[in-house]
Amino acid sequence: MGKIVVSENVSLDGVTQDPTGEEGFRHGGWFGQIGEKDREAWAKMELDEALGAEALLLGRRSDEWFAARWLSRSGDWADRLNSLPKYVVSSTVEEPRWANATVLTGDVADAVSKLKQELDGDIVVYASTQLVRTLMEHDLVDEYRLLVFPTVVGEGTRLFEPGRARAD
């Protein structure tokens, strides 16, 4: 059985919104506040995670974001991400933008539960906050890998919103 692994970059106060500053969020770009040594360690962790993954699971916006940036890149990490099977959850997309991708439609919980039954390894979810919240609501997340950045953003989209069900 596959395992859903949520891998997120988060600030100290839990914000996941616009870490690179490319989405127009006024507090975006907090990812860039780490030093070169930390960036190298982060890149190694991300590569190791990608090498250990069987597939990626993404929401529509994350598929679009990643495809726009990764399709033209090369190197160990880019090559691995581009070659991994990808599953994009969407009610509007017919053709995902990133290569080697399949669209999952219909009931999200049912589609992801079926995917977990079909695969054996880690199914890594990058970004995709709305999708992650849906997965949490249906108790489909098996593991959280949160890379906490040493900054307080103050406002923005948080992975764990107040009043949400407990995530174990």
Can you annotate each of these PLM segments?
Residues M1-D168:
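Enzymes that bind and transform nitrogen-containing heteroaromatic metabolites
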